[in-house]
Amino acid sequence: KIKYHLEIFSQEPKELNFNLEEDITGLDQVVVSASRTGQLRQTAPVIVSVTSSKDFQATQSISLSEGLNFQPGLRMETNCQNCGFSQVRMNGLDGAYSQILIKSRPIFSALNGVYGLDQIPANSIERVEVVRGGGSALYGSNAIAGTINIITKEPTENLFEIASNFAAIGGKAGDQAVSLNGIVLSNDYKTGLSIFGMFRDRKPFDQNGDGFTEITKVENKTFGFNSFFKPGERSKLSLDFHTIHE
């Protein structure tokens, strides 16, 4: 919030210099998962935990599942040694009892909520809002344990980013990930397009040499885009597309 009182009695221009301080606690940010409408976090009727894009960058998270490890009250766990799928556990309940949303819409099915968390690139996420407990049932019958609302990035400026990340599991198995993100805006800011993608190749890892991998091989490709058109000041048409292959 910026509050400044200024009185000008002449026609001469007046120059003002001021500094903005970052809100460390994040209480003034707007969330939509509390009541399905945008409101300040400090006035929301339920507790909403937010993980921003800065948190994904600080933790070097490649996918959504890696970033959720740092969210209070959530736990990512691997439940299958054969396929290596991971699910989020909230309030001690399995992933099937949590509702996963993209821009407040229940696009994810119960099956995709298990396998899809590893395939959403972190560079496409603006923030993740988490509501724990029965109050999140506002979004559907699956939201018994809680709701995870994924807010993707809105096109705000023209840019293109490409990043590569390599990790060695146990000094043996390589994990290579390449991600890209591009935004194109019109001159009047009424039309915008944001594209994102990720390619990941993870080699299998066998710790004790018994022929069974503790960490399975993964090769997935993810691509999608977000677009919008504003025909008026209070109207907006949006079109989103996501494709995932593993």
What spans do the regions from the language model cover?
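Transmembrane beta-barrel outer-membrane domains
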Residues: T25, Q81, S141, G171-D175, ...
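Short strand-turn segments of transmembrane beta-barrel domains in outer membranes
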Residues: G135-S136, T147, K153-V184, T216
